[in-house]
Design a protein with these regions (language model features):
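A conserved beta-strand-loop-helix scaffold within acyl/acetyltransferase catalytic domains
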Residues: 1-50
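Short loop segments at secondary-structure junctions
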Residues: 19-22, 54, 122-126
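Short acidic (Asp/Glu) patches
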Residues: 30-31, 64-68, 99-106
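Conserved active-site alpha-helix within GNAT-family acetyltransferase domains
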Residues: 74-79, 84-109
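C-terminal "cap" of GNAT-fold acetyltransferases
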Residues: 104-140
Length: 140
């Protein structure tokens, strides 16, 4: 990736995978105060899961996600969400498709829809029984 990618928020943590003093992968970890069906909750959002091409298929992304989940659990976060182009990979890391309405802001405009790429992972003892996820701002 090139350029100023983190245009909305700077991640809470950036988890790196390093081999031979080179970054070979990373995932951005965000903590976000949201509303789940009108109830306040802090959730985790994972973004920018990237692994260098020659390291793909070797468990690097799974290790990054596992570490990101550990960080979120340290903050008693019950849910981690992400927005994926393809669900296939993230299913093996415990994510399931979200079927709820998501509200957010994009280009200073309020939007809402059910996003096919939205996925959630239950990190705590609570179940994701959410009808409306209010992100209280822009999508990362």
């Amino acid at each position: 990736m090139k350029g100023n990618f983190y245009q909305v928020d700077i991640p809470y943590k950036l988890v790196l995978a390093i081999d031979d003093n080179q970054v070979i992968g990373h995932v951005a970890v965000y903590l976000r105060d949201v509303y789940l069906d009108s109830f306040p909750e802090t959730i985790g959002i994972l973004s920018c899961v990237v692994v260098a091409h020659k390291y793909r298929g070797k468990g690097v992304a799974a290790s990054l996600i596992k570490r990101a989940h550990a960080i979120l659990k340290e903050h008693s976060v019950n849910f981690s969400i992400l927005f994926a182009v393809s669900h296939a990979y993230y299913l093996s890391s415990g994510y399931i498709p979200m079927k709820n309405l998501t509200r957010f802001i994009e280009n200073n405009e309020k939007k809402e829809f059910i996003y096919d790429g939205g996925m959630v992972c239950e990190l705590g003892s609570q179940n994701w029984n959410v009808n409306i996820l209010e992100l209280n701002g822009e999508v990362v």
